[in-house]
Amino acid sequence: MINDVISPEFDENGRALRRIRSFVRRQGRLTKGQQLALDSYWPVMGVEYQAAPVDLNTLFGREAPIVLEIGFGMGTSLVTMATNNPQQNFLGIEVHSPGVGACLSSAHDAGLSNLRIMCHDAVEVLENMIPEASLDMVQLFFPDPWHKARHNKRRIVQTPFVELVKSKLKVGGVFHMATDWQPYAEHMLEVMSGVSGYLNLSEQNDYVPRPDSRPLTKFELRGQRLGHGVWDLMFERKE
């Protein structure tokens, strides 16, 4: 395991700084199918990281609403959404290679042309590659809740991240989060409510019912049978 939670950054004088990441990069073993997908389909759907803005319309070869998903896991839901919404362009980011391979394989089998995949830290992608006010939706489904209190600072949903997402959304664009850990849902709501320029789309100013746009996962169905909850939050950029 490579600990990527803390990564070095440098100030203007070249002094090393510590940056807390929201994930630990686990180099899981690739199956033969996942490796084949990476070798065969990455050149078609994969996007290499670059520290400069990218033209998203050129990336997809067309102009269409753009949905960015952060941390797509094995890609099952992402591929389903891209299949069900051919009128939209989807950009998925995942740091774990087996998930990237699995997603590429599923996307190829589905014959998708509206999906692009990245294997990199999503914060760096947002900071450096995504143009300002270019995204119609950002999706963050079931991020690591970092249950222990001493690890809460590693949660990706923090004020600087939420501000960063807002800057990349178009006015009217939506930041959609979902979690099955109630303390994290409460944390998300507190952070989002403290940032100006967002409108909570919940009528009760808290959580929204799962929209049809977010597929119901097998894990979620199993949790429902056991009485476990899932909390969706949707906030629109209003300015």
From Swiss-Prot:
Keyword Transport applies: no
Cystines in this chain: none
Active site: D144
Pfam families, sorted: Methyltransf_4 (PF02390)
Metabolic or biological pathway: tRNA modification; N(7)-methylguanine-tRNA biosynthesis
Sorted UniProt keywords: Methyltransferase, S-adenosyl-L-methionine, Transferase, tRNA processing
Binding site for S-adenosyl-L-methionine: E69, E94, D121, D144
Substrates-to-products reaction catalysed: guanosine(46) in tRNA + S-adenosyl-L-methionine = N(7)-methylguanosine(46) in tRNA + S-adenosyl-L-homocysteine
Gene Ontology BP, a term: RNA (guanine-N7)-methylation
Gene3D superfamilies in the record: Vaccinia Virus protein VP39
MF annotations from Gene Ontology: tRNA (guanine(46)-N7)-methyltransferase activity
Region Interaction with RNA: start-end pairs: 150-155
Family annotation (PROSITE patterns): SAM_MT_TRMB (PS51625)
Residues where substrate binds: K148, D180, T217, K218, F219, E220
Record EC number: 2.1.1.33
InterPro entries with a match to the protein in the record: SAM-dependent_MTases_sf, tRNA_(Gua-N-7)_MeTrfase_Trmb, tRNA_methyltr_TrmB_bact
Keyword GTP-binding: no
Cellular component per GO, a single term: tRNA methyltransferase complex
PANTHER family: 3-DEOXY-D-MANNO-OCTULOSONIC-ACID TRANSFERASE/TRNA GUANINE-N 7 - -METHYLTRANSFERASE (PTHR23417), PENTACOTRIPEPTIDE-REPEAT REGION OF PRORP DOMAIN-CONTAINING PROTEIN (PTHR23417:SF14)
Self-association state and partner proteins as the record states: Monomer.
NCBIfam families: tRNA (guanosine(46)-N7)-methyltransferase TrmB (TIGR00091)
Family per record: Belongs to the class I-like SAM-binding methyltransferase superfamily. TrmB family.
Its job: Catalyzes the formation of N(7)-methylguanine at position 46 (m7G46) in tRNA.
Protein name from the UniProt record: tRNA (guanine-N(7)-)-methyltransferase
Name of the gene this protein is made from: trmB
